[in-house]
Amino acid sequence: MWSDSLVSRICVPIIVVCTSIALLNVVSFRSECSCVVHISGAAIDIRGCSFTPDFIEYAKTLRVFNHRYQE
């Protein structure tokens, strides 16, 4: 039979390693988030983007979506 001491010596390091790997994945994912531009009928939402001069020029051309019939 397994003793409690042996189980804790095996399980605790495995849990610590798995938790560390999961946390590193979350942190690296957050640092590599992509740029999202959401255009709706009311607003333009820009998230996670690097505001380079080229991106700023692009962002200046954005307009909200107008779905009304134009005569």
From Swiss-Prot:
Subcellular location: Host endoplasmic reticulum membrane
Full protein name: Movement protein TGBp3
One Pfam assignment: TGBp3
Taxonomic lineage from the root: Viruses, Riboviria, Orthornavirae, Kitrinoviricota, Alsuviricetes
Note: TGBp1, TGBp2 and TGBp3 seem to act together for cell-to-cell propagation. TGBp1 is the main movement protein that physically cross the plasmodesma with the viral genome. TGBp2 and TGBp3 would facilitate TGBp1 function.
Spans within the Cytoplasmic topological domain: 28-71
Keywords attached to this entry: Host endoplasmic reticulum, Host membrane, Membrane, Transmembrane, Transmembrane helix, Transport, Viral movement protein
Gene Ontology terms: biological process: transport of virus in host, cell to cell
Spans within the Lumenal topological domain: 1-4
The protein's role, per its UniProt record: Plays a role in viral cell-to-cell propagation, by facilitating genome transport to neighboring plant cells through plasmosdesmata. May induce the formation of granular vesicles derived from the Endoplasmic reticulum, which align on actin filaments.
Keyword Protein biosynthesis annotated: no
Protein species of origin: Poplar mosaic virus (isolate ATCC Pv275) (PMV)
InterPro entries found in the cross-reference section: TGBp3
Taxonomic superkingdom: Viruses
Segments crossing the lipid bilayer: 5-27
Family the entry assigns: Belongs to the Tymovirales TGBp3 protein family.
Cellular component GO terms held in the UniProt record: host cell endoplasmic reticulum membrane; membrane
